[in-house]
Amino acid sequence: MNRRTFCKTAIAAGVAASLPLNRLLAIESGALASDIPAVTLSGSEITLEKAAVEEFAGSLRGQLLTPSSGGAYEAARRVWNGMFDKHPALIARCAGAADVSHAVKFAAERNLLVAVRGGGHSISGKSTCDGGIVIDLSPMQGIRVDPERKRAWVQPGVLGVSLDRENEYYGFITPMGTVSHTGAAGLTLGGGFGRTSRKHGLACDNVLAVDIVTADGTLRHANRKENPDLYWGVRGGGGNFGVVTSFLYRANVAGPMVLGGAVVHSIDNYKEVLKFWADFQATATRELYIGVGTFPGPGGDPIVVIDTCWCGDLKKGEKVLAPVRAFGKPLADDIKVQRYVTLQASNDEGLGHGVREYMKSGFITETSDDLIDAIVENRNTSPTAWFFIMPTGGAISDVGLTDTAFPVRNAIGNMMTGTVSPDATQDQAAIQSTRAYWKHLESHTRGYYINLNEDVTEKKTRSNFGPNLARLTEIKNTYDPGNLFRLNANIRPEV
């Protein structure tokens, strides 16, 4: 190599070394080859200039993906619910809070449509968008458990299974859904029901503090003393107020072993099983999670399932669940002592990534004969339809209605139903069959769980927050007056 060639090579290497790695990679991969068409909050079309996108990419520790990024973009744009096949203009795969702040500022300056993705498990597809920016938190997977203080610090890309397993090592449980690959962040912000919630409360009830980037790009800490309004709002108010970059949870002494599993009955005995469940659940102690519903069976025919989890003394649990196991003529009974993390994954296979699902849900405050009749007599007969009542009450009801933003505390169950579509050609049939069934059930409900409902009107969303709406609107006015964070159970600002 002659001196001139060596100098050119050295200069090129020096220039490359001065560029942030991800910007260099983006340029080399062709991801920033041209301007990028995008969509604003109002739906109008704009162009993101190449230079601005390059500068944004250079500010990130994480990776910035565009539609020309190839396989990486294709993988990152996909979400759990396969019904939503959207193509954002940008996906900012954030490595930390600074990246989140840069992404929020970039979006706000351009009035760009924003979706926030934690685990990507949003049933309504709100963790992605067409033409906007996805602030992707999935690379932020840190967990730190403090066994002395019984606390767990968790980043927003963490899935429930990861927190469950980390907690298990120390002998703790934090309620974290009933499907193990659900993202902790979205679950918590909307409330967060789990198999131990009757004993330990909702996921949001276990939040002691958060770090959150608000619409102006500022990173704020929120707890009972610092920014208490934000702390109140993120516990059940969804993603309305910003992007949470870390949660501090209470870690409850529990497990690692629980008694649980399912008892299966014939669909011919559906009404009898529902009535048994209603009577049994009415006197259940808070250590017991016991739900009931119908699901497609192994041969395609529907089956009735009583789903259980006992998180107290195991010998006592055997006695408590004995009547459940003895009732009727079960087709199967797999209740057993098992690891909590194993039971948490028991629903995963049927709810894997890419499933095409449409759902409706609502809270019930009683299981009247009229409700049971409506459930049974109007059953959705689609071969992929399902129905389930998740038990609530217990510790969930210990929290006052206005103590957090979560709007429903007096329910005895969360009634939900849905239909899985085999492919895109059958999506509308799945949607229509679910809606038709729900028409017979909705009048028996009192409010709904914001994490599980699709295509809900703004009027219904506002009504659902009840006495908490005024305070939520005030917080929205303060921290997101332009409604940058609107792909959620949206609280429209009034400024």
State where each predicted segment sits.
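Soluble FAD-dependent oxygen oxidases
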Residues: 2-495
